[in-house]
Amino acid sequence: MKTLDEIKIQLESLKPVLKDKFQVETVGIFGSYSQGLQKHKSDVDILVTFSEPNDIDLLDFIALKQFLSRKLKIKVDLVEKHALKTRLKDRILKETIYV
């Protein structure tokens, strides 16, 4: 099982590629990993913002999710900050650990 620190280090090293290839402006971890409640089979919840959100289509989003899963070697649940549901937004933003 990966630790939060291992995931943070990997995401930090991927930031240049995330920015250049996928237009990712910010990346953070929320959910069970940010709360220290992850289990052996937990996925990692990743919150992103894009520098040009209107230029990102569904295929780009899926490609980013697959890229992160492959690089981190763990299932990724990817969420775009602007797509957060109102009822969950405050909680998620409070617990997000930005890289």
Predicted regions, residues:
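Catalytic core of pol beta-like nucleotidyltransferases
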Residues: 1-26, 35-40, 51-99
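Hydrophobic alpha-helical positions that pack around
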Residues: 29
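Short hydrophobic/aromatic beta-strand micro-patches
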Residues: 47-49
